A protein has these predicted regions:
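Low-complexity, intrinsically disordered or signal/transmembrane-proximal segments
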Residues: 2-4, 11
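NAD(P)+-binding Rossmann beta1-loop-alpha1 motif at the extreme N-terminus of oxidoreductases
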Residues: 11-93, 119, 156-159
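General beta-strand structural signal in soluble alpha/beta enzymes
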Residues: 78-79, 124, 146-150, 190-192, ...
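Beta-loop-alpha module in the N-terminal Rossmann-like domain of NAD(P)-dependent dehydrogenases
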Residues: 83, 95-111, 129-132
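Rossmann-fold NAD(P)-binding glycine/threonine-rich loop
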Residues: 121, 125-174
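Helical "substrate-binding/catalytic lid" subdomain
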Residues: 162, 166-168, 176, 183, ...
Length: 291
């Protein structure tokens, strides 16, 4: 498939200011690379291309990349190596990395730093540690490459619901990727507008936010995950109590290894825990997608 090179794409242009300093100015990026086509990576590509943007995709399993490209051949191109991003993406290149955090991400980012050129963009959308982002940003900057970290929440349900995006990096670069963020995020329709808000719809209301400089996106995602795990732990503890609220109905052996139940008459409830969670999902203050 041939990329539509004549369409408007996002790229950086060098502009010489009156003080003699050369800076980069940006237009909106409409072509993006994606490395890692697991359930989230592939669904991100589907949302991006359903919005009319273009994607160049790579996965270590070449058949996965070819299969995804076959779903939308006018907007998705499969390549067989990371080095091909240098020629497959037009204008300013932006490549989104969606692989497991740690050594795999480290290896991919290093290869991209040797593949891309000044003013290109590396996007880490995995669950990397924010302090690693700081180092990746510094390393990329030595080659003039921009680094953007994106805490991506939405899981396998994001294809239909959209993805919440917590973003760190230079403001101008993040803004240049607005079309991509808007394609991926849930959109303003995902939730009622918060009381007190008025005027133009903000990016946060669309489901994405520039949280700050390098590392800010993954820092916010780290806290998000901590809250998520805390919620799941609270649910688990509470539901376990409900499940075992019938202990007073069970025979208990009196021995050194069995704690006595002081008032068995207080614990004689046979709760339908699944049904309780169903009602909690409907109007309860503890209602949550996690339920």
């Amino acid at each position: 498939m041939q990329l539509h090179l004549k369409e408007k794409v996002l790229y950086a242009k060098n502009t010489v200011m009156s003080n003699g300093v050369t800076v980069a100015t940006y237009e909106n990026i409409t072509h993006i690379g994606m490395i890692g086509l697991g359930r989230m990576g592939a669904n991100l590509v589907r949302r991006i291309t359903r919005a009319g943007l273009h994607a160049v995709v790579y996965d270590t399993n070449a058949e996965v990349a070819k299969s995804l490209a076959a779903e939308n051949p006018d907007h998705i191109t499969a390549i067989s190596s990371i080095s091909e991003f240098a020629t497959a993406l037009p204008g300013q290149r932006a490549v989104w990395v969606m692989v497991p955090a740690g050594t795999i991400t480290e290896s991919v980012i290093t290869e991209l730093q040797h593949t891309l050129s000044a003013n290109d963009i590396i996007i880490d959308g995995g669950n990397s540690y924010y302090r690693d982002d700081l180092e990746h940003s510094k390393q990329s900057a030595t080659k003039g490459i921009h680094f953007v970290d994106v805490g991506t929440s939405g899981g396998v349900w994001g294809l239909e619901r959209g993805y919440c995006l917590m973003i760190g990096g230079d403001a101008e670069v993040v803004t240049a990727l607005s079309d991509v963020w808007n394609a991926v995020a849930p959109g303003v329709e995902a939730a009622p507008r918060s009381p007190g808000l008025s005027g133009d719809i903000t990016p946060a209301e669309r489901g994405w936010l520039h949280c700050g400089p390098s590392g800010a996106g993954h820092f916010v995602k780290m806290i998000h995950n901590g809250i998520e795990y805390g919620l799941m732990a609270a649910y688990a503890e509470g539901l376990n109590i409900l499940k075992n609220a019938n202990e007073g109905l069970k025979p208990r052996t009196a021995d050194a290894e069995t704690a006595p139940l002081a008032h068995p008459e207080h614990y004689q409830y046979e709760f339908d825990v699944a049904a309780i969670t169903e009602i909690w999902r409907r109007g309860s203050v503890v209602a949550s997608w996690l339920l």
